[in-house]
Regions:
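Active-site anion-handling motifs in enzyme catalytic cores
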Residues: 1-230
Length: 230
């Protein structure tokens, strides 16, 4: 039985947004992505690599040898990926992940490079675009077209991100919303209470803080709920 399971085992790499961050939203999204990947690949060898820290050679080798590598949510894409490194990756890193096990002499063989690209699948899983920005730079277009798989569908969290990728020539993309929402089936939603509770959970954004508006919101919540959790 174990031998049969190992035959179906897939090496799955997760670009994990929770490494080197205190943003609790990233943990929620990462957990949702893990549930999705477990459903798709019940038997898997799972490896997590960072998105906020630059990848080591070991991490890049894991990506290059994986059956699939998934970018687990959050707004990692940006219009200027040279300067705004929400996803801390460079063009050279992208090439290393997709061609790293080729010998230097083989890098001149475009057939081998094409075959290697076809074997390395880096796929977006509910990923979004950082804020609302100007048109993407030529560097951003090049790095994303080098990084992202051209065979499988990419899942992005909103229509804005999908349109950005379409304009870059990346057409195998669907607007699926955030993976945290994928479990909100009709049956699940029917179980959600419709009456007002006595306790409420809220969050505050630290990287775009608005102290005055935050204080107004917290005051209002304290007025209407017995307990407020932040």
């Amino acid at each position: 039985m174990m031998d049969q399971e190992m035959q179906h085992c897939r090496k799955i790499v997760r670009f994990d947004p929770t490494i080197s961050t205190a943003n609790q939203g990233d943990f929620i999204i990462r957990n949702a992505c893990e549930h999705v990947l477990h459903d798709c690949f019940p038997v898997q060898l799972s490896v997590a690599v960072p998105v906020r820290d630059r990848l080591s050679k070991v991490s890049m080798k894991h990506v290059g040898s994986a059956d699939y590598a998934f970018v687990c949510g959050t707004n990692l894409l940006s219009s200027d990926m040279r300067r705004q490194r929400m996803w801390n990756i460079r063009l050279r890193d992208a090439l290393m992940m997709r061609c790293g096990d080729l010998h230097k002499r083989e890098l001149l063989n475009f057939r081998l490079i094409r075959e290697k690209f076809q074997r390395t699948h880096i796929i977006l899983l509910g990923t979004g675009w950082y804020q609302y920005q100007d048109e993407p730079t030529g560097y951003t277009k090049r790095i994303l077209k080098t990084l992202l798989d051209g065979q499988y569908l990419h899942a992005v969290r909103d229509e804005y991100t999908r349109q950005r990728l379409l304009k870059l020539g990346i057409t195998n993309v669907l607007n699926t919303a955030c993976p945290t929402m994928w479990g909100l089936t009709a049956d699940k939603c029917a179980q959600i209470p419709t009456h007002k509770a006595e306790r409420v959970v809220t969050t505050l954004t630290d990287y775009r803080s608005s102290p005055e508006q935050d204080a107004q919101m917290l005051t209002m919540l304290q007025k209407h709920y017995r307990e407020v959790y932040v």
